[in-house]
Every structure is written in structure tokens, then in C-alpha cells.
């Protein structure tokens, strides 16, 4: 799980905006959550990227720009359904990304293996992806 969630944060940092210390929140033991999906932080299966910029319940259209949403859609498409995004939840929380499959799901293990392989190959993986290529845009369209 850590490999996949770190990949999401790295893609955000490389393709949307640089992240600073404190911009990513992951596992917590604080049981106070604003909505059900935030409880995924308790199990370490979710991260929030810049939660103060993109808070729970923010009005749609006030968070990420349309171009940034294209990047998020590409990240989701690249993760093949393993990652869920808070921009698709009610209430909205565009900073929220979570593992969207059950423990032991083979898709999670397959994705983590692929990411680890890309991390070892220069010129591939996070930091080398152009989410605006036509083929990638077509695949990501289902996640907008």
C-alpha cells in the first residue's frame, strides 16, 4: 500500500505542484473523522495531499483547476481502479486518495510490482509521465 500511495503523492508533486513538509497526511491514530472515508487514514490506506487547500466539503469547482484534474484522472487511470479520489465522493475532499480495493486484491499487488519496477528503470514512472498525451487523455477521460 505504501508503494502505491507514495506513487500518488510523487505524481502530484511532479505534475501538479511541489510538495512541502506537512503537505501530505497519511496514517493517523486520531479517531475524529469528518466522514466515513476519512477513517481509511486509521488503517494507513489513505493519504490527503494538501488537506488545508482542498478541505472536506469544499464547494465543487473551488479546489483543483481543470488541468490539475486531468492529471488526477491520469493518476487514477494509471492505477487501474486501485486508487479512489475524494473528488468523486460526497462530501467532496479533493485532497483525499485511498486504496479502493479489499486487502489481498491482486490488482494492488500487481500495481505495486509495476511501480517498483518503474522506480528501478531510469526514465520511467513518476516524474517521466506526460498526462496530456492523446492516448493518456483518452484513458483518463473515464476518471474525470
Which residues does each predicted region cover?
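Catalytic cores and adjacent binding grooves of peptidoglycan-active enzymes
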Residues: 38-44, 55-144
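Active-site acidic/histidine clusters and adjacent loop/turn architecture
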Residues: 1-16
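Mid-length scaffold segments of soluble, non-membrane domains
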Residues: 15-60
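A generic short-segment signal for beta-strand/edge and adjacent turn/coil regions
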Residues: 12-20, 65-68
Amino acid at each position: 500500500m505504501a508503494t502505491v500511495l507514495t506513487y500518488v503523492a510523487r505524481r502530484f508533486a511532479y505534475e501538479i505542484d511541489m510538495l512541502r513538509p506537512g503537505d501530505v497526511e497519511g496514517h493517523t491514530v486520531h479517531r475524529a473523522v469528518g466522514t466515513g472515508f476519512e477513517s481509511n487514514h486509521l488503517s494507513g490506506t489513505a493519504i490527503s495531499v494538501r488537506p488545508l487547500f482542498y478541505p472536506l466539503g469544499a464547494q465543487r469547482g473551488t479546489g483543483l483547476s481543470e488541468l490539475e484534474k486531468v492529471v488526477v484522472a491520469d493518476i487514477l487511470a494509471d492505477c487501474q481502479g486501485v486508487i479512489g479520489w475524494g473528488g468523486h465522493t460526497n462530501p467532496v475532499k479533493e485532497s483525499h486518495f485511498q486504496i479502493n480495493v479489499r486487502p489481498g486484491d491482486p490488482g494492488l499487488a500487481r500495481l505495486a510490482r509495476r511501480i517498483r519496477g518503474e522506480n528501478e528503470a531510469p526514465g520511467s514512472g513518476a516524474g517521466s509521465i506526460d498526462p496530456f498525451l492523446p492516448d493518456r487523455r483518452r484513458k483518463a477521460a473515464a476518471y474525470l
